[in-house]
Design a protein with these regions (language model features):
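Glycine-rich phosphate-binding loop of ATP-dependent small-molecule kinases
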Residues: 1-238
Length: 238
C-alpha cells in the first residue's frame, strides 16, 4: 500500500470502502485531480474515469469524435458537451462501474451536470452525486502546467520546477529527450483557465445549492489532500 493511501487510512478511523454512486472531482487544470483519483481508486476500490484519458484515447485513435475534440484542444477550448457526454456514456456502460466510480474532469459545465444527475436518478443508484473541488492558487497551477515535461518513450512525467530529471531535458529512465505537450504553454493555460472558470462556476453553484459540494486545499501533500476528500465525502453522505 502506498504511503499516501496509508495516510488516508490513518486519517479516517472508520470509513466505508463501498461507494455505490459517482463522486465528482472538480478543479482547474493542474490541480491534481488525476493524482487524487488514483489514491481514491485504491482506497475505495472503484474505477477512475478521466475525461482527459477518454479524449486522448479517441484523439490517438483518430475517431470522428477524437478529430473534432483535437481541434478544440489545440485552440485551448473545452470540448463540447455532446462529445464528452457520448464518450462518458460509453464508459459508464462497462461492468466495473456497477458499484460506483470517480469522475475526473467531468462534469465541467452545468449541462453536463444536469445530464449526469439525470443518469444517476434513472440507473438505480441509492446515493446522490457528490462533488468535491480541489483548490490550488493560480500561480502554483501555472508552475505545475508550464513546467510539465513527458518522456515520449516510457511516459514518465517530470516538472522542471518541482520534480526535475537528474539530467536537464532528458528522462532518467530511458535517456530520451523530454517533450512538452502542445497545450502545456502559458498562453493555452490562460485560455483554459478562462474557459474553465466561466463554465464550471455554475456546476459548483449547482451542487453547493443541493448541499452536496465541498472544497479542499490542494496545495499540500498528496496523502493529506486524499484524507480531506474522504472526510468531505463522508460528511456529505450524512
Amino acid at each position: 500500500m502506498s504511503s499516501s493511501v496509508v495516510a488516508v487510512e490513518q486519517g479516517r478511523e472508520a470509513v466505508s470502502k463501498t461507494v455505490p454512486g459517482p463522486i465528482l472531482l472538480l478543479g482547474a487544470p493542474g490541480s491534481g485531480k488525476g493524482t487524487q483519483s488514483d489514491q481514491l481508486v485504491k482506497f475505495w476500490n472503484i474505477p477512475h474515469i478521466s475525461t482527459g484519458d477518454l479524449l486522448r484515447a479517441n484523439m490517438a485513435k483518430g475517431t470522428s469524435l477524437g478529430k473534432i475534440a483535437q481541434q478544440s484542444v489545440n485552440r485551448g477550448e473545452l470540448v463540447h458537451d455532446s462529445l464528452v457526454n457520448e464518450m462518458v456514456a460509453a464508459r459508464l456502460k462497462e461492468p466495473d462501474t456497477a458499484n460506483g466510480y470517480i469522475l475526473d474532469g467531468f462534469p465541467r459545465t452545468l449541462g453536463q451536470a444536469t445530464w449526469l444527475d439525470g443518469r444517476v436518478a434513472t440507473d438505480g443508484k441509492s446515493l446522490p452525486v457528490i462533488a468535491v473541488s480541489i483548490h490550488v492558487d493560480y500561480n502554483q497551477l501555472l508552475r505545475r502546467i508550464t513546467g510539465r515535461r513527458n518522456c515520449p518513450v516510457c511516459g514518465t512525467i517530470y516538472n522542471i520546477h518541482m520534480n526535475p530529471p537528474k539530467r536537464d531535458g532528458f528522462c532518467d529512465v530511458e535517456g530520451a529527450a523530454l517533450v512538452q505537450r502542445a497545450d502545456d504553454t502559458e498562453q493555452v493555460f490562460q485560455e483554459r483557465m478562462r474557459a474553465y472558470t466561466g463554465l464550471t462556476a455554475p456546476v459548483v453553484e449547482h451542487y453547493r445549492a443541493l448541499g452536496r459540494f465541498a472544497e479542499v486545499d490542494g496545495d499540500r501533500p498528496i496523502g493529506l489532500i486524499a484524507a480531506a476528500i474522504v472526510a468531505a465525502v463522508e460528511r456529505l453522505r450524512k
